[in-house]
Amino acid sequence: MANRNKPINDSSGMMTISEDGNLVVLNGQGEVLWSSNVSIGFNQSTAQLTDDGNLVLKAGPNGNLVWQSFQQPTDTYIPKMRLSSNARTGKKTLLMSWRSSSDPSVGNFSAGLNPLGIPEHFIWYNGHPFWRSGPWGGQNFIGIPEMYTSVYLQGFSVQEEADGTFTLSLIEDPVIRET
C-alpha cells in the first residue's frame, strides 16, 4: 500500500505519472498523497506491474529502471523481493506491520535482517528485538531447524554483496502440492 499512512477511503483516488516523471497517488482533490520521489529530470516515464508483482517505474528513451516497489516493501513479502541490510550505511529494507486490522498505517512491529555481525532475521517491537531466527548457517537460520522441511521456508538465501549489504531473498518459487 503506497499511501498507508494517508489511505484513501473512497474510490476517488488515482495513481498516475506526474509532470516530473514520478509515480504518484492522488486523492479526489488532486492532492499528492504519495510519490516515488526520484529525480528523473524529464517526463518520459512508464509504469509496469511485472509478472512477479513488482511495480516498476522506468524513465528515458532506454527505459532505465528508476524505482521499484520491491525496494520499498510494506507489510507483505513476495517471492523475488529482497530484504537487505548494510551495517556500514545503516540502510535496510524492512517489512512493517499494520497498526491494527482496520488501520493500515505503520504499526509497532517490523521485520528484516539485523545489520550487525552474522546476518539474522529479526522481528522488532517498537525498535526492540522481539524474536530472532538465529544466525544464517549457509543453508538455513540455525534457530529455525524446520526450514528444511517446511514448504513455506524452503529456498531462502542470504548473500553478502560487495558493498557489505546482506540480502535475504527467496531464490526459488515455492511449489505447494496437495497430497
Q: Model features per residue range: what roles?
A:
Residues M1-T179:
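Beta-rich ligand-binding surfaces for carbohydrates and other polyanions
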